[in-house]
């Protein structure tokens, strides 16, 4: 989508113009194949062409249908779209998407880190948690794409804490933001 003019410009995604450039680059430099070609190649032990690319899209967002599909259709390209079963069968927003929304809904990531500090302190005895500083030192490592605070928030809420606590905290923050 056109990120800067979208409803949630701070939700991480690929801007539509950059996606178009990527597709044009792949069309020029690679052989974009279909899922049927991959299956045929496996079933018949036939090599796929060199520099082959299979286009795949995780999460099956409406953005994919509204923005990606028309571009692929224009060039007669196929993409494989993978919808998360939990979101469909349970009619729920995935925690990873809630976390993206929370991060996009506040510019003050330090305030969000401080909220997490209070929540860790609140649940510390019940869940036998380490002190907050332990988690921050362990997880807050800046990456190429995210600041150390954003990485900390993502890692704490996606993997570090036990699942039921992660869900409680994510739901609390999602409701707030």
State what each model feature region is.
Residues 56, 60-69:
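Membrane-embedded segments
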Residues 26, 58, 72, 81, ...:
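Conserved, mostly hydrophobic/aromatic
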Residues 2-14:
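Acidic/histidine-rich helix-loop elements
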Residues 33, 55-57, 79-81:
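Hydrophobic faces of well-ordered beta-strands that scaffold small-molecule active sites
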Residues 76-102:
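A short, conserved beta-to-alpha structural element at the edge of catalytic cores
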Residues 2-5, 41-42, 63-65, 88-93:
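Short catalytic/ligand-binding loop motif for oxyanion handling, primarily in non-cytosolic enzymes
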Residues 11-47:
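C-terminal domain-boundary segment and adjacent tail
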Residues 93-177:
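Extended, charge-rich helix/loop segments that form flexible
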């Amino acid at each position: 989508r056109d990120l800067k003019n979208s409803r949630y410009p701070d939700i991480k995604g690929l801007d539509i113009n950059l996606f178009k450039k990527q597709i044009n680059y792949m069309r020029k430099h690679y052989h974009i194949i279909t899922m049927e070609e991959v299956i045929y190649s496996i079933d018949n032990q036939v090599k796929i062409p060199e520099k082959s690319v299979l286009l795949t899209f995780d999460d099956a967002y409406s953005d994919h249908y509204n923005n990606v599909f028309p571009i692929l259709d224009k060039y007669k390209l196929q993409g494989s779209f993978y919808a998360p079963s939990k979101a469909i069968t349970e009619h729920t927003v995935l925690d990873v998407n809630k976390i993206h929304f929370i991060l996009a809904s506040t510019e003050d990531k330090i305030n969000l880190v401080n909220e997490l500090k209070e929540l860790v302190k609140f649940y510390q005895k019940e869940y036998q948690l380490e002190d907050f500083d332990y988690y921050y030192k362990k997880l807050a490592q800046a990456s190429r794409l995210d600041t150390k605070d954003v990485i900390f928030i993502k890692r704490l809420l996606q993997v570090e804490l036990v699942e039921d606590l992660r869900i409680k905290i994510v739901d609390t923050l999602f409701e707030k933001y």
